[in-house]
Design a protein with these regions (language model features):
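C-terminal and inter-domain tail/linker signature
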Residues: 1-200
Length: 200
């Protein structure tokens, strides 16, 4: 809570010998950000799934967890319907405090009512030109968690584009710019179950 309005943030701490060694924070101030996408007020909901310990048979080693999260970014970049990762049937994504999957109330996208895999199979995110400077500073094998950071670049050149189902839609981002992100993935049995992203 800031003096004039609430803000959403993601925070990464690196602890060494019981001392803070690194701090990384992304703060979304919806009243101050450029309005390429109009974000609703964030809705913060506790997600116990991020704390649950996975049964051993559903865990994956560190390198595989990173590969699954990296495959998500490969799928997102110039999204044309091709999947480079796997999604759990109950997968949900929250972006800047807004649930953007399985949520027909989302006003800024035509695919909000669909699940993670269905959205990507449509090629909805073609306007995401590049996912660069990817880092994976935190991996928790027991909980199936990967925290990623990086930049989403938008060239801003797309006006309209065609989804894989034949629909023609307007690109939501119309000028060149980049978002910086912190994105947390919960991965169960090799499939992405929950995504929580904060980007500015």
């Amino acid at each position: 809570e800031e003096p004039q309005f609430p803000s959403l943030f993601a925070l990464r701490l690196r602890i060494e010998r019981q001392r803070i060694a690194e701090v990384e924070m992304v703060i979304l101030r919806t009243v101050a950000e450029p309005k390429s996408i109009i974000w609703p007020e964030p809705v913060l909901v506790d997600k116990p799934v991020f704390r649950e310990i996975l049964p051993p048979e559903q865990r994956r080693p560190r390198e595989r967890l990173i590969s699954i999260a990296d495959g998500y970014f490969d799928t997102l970049q110039l999204n044309d319907g091709t999947l480079f990762t796997e999604f759990h049937e109950d997968c949900n994504r929250v972006e800047n405090g807004t649930k953007t999957t399985n949520n027909p109330a989302v006003a800024f996208t035509s695919v909000g009512a669909l699940g993670c895999e269905e959205q990507f199979r449509l090629g909805n995110y073609r306007y995401d030109t590049a996912l660069r400077a990817r880092r994976f500073p935190l991996v928790d094998e027991e909980r199936g968690l990967v925290l990623a950071s990086g930049f989403i670049d938008h060239s801003g050149v797309l006006d309209k584009y065609t989804l894989t189902d034949g629909r023609v839609i307007d690109a939501p981002i119309r000028y060149p710019h980049s978002f910086y992100l912190l994105e947390l993935f919960r991965i169960e049995d090799g499939k992405i179950r929950q995504i929580e992203a904060v980007f500015v």
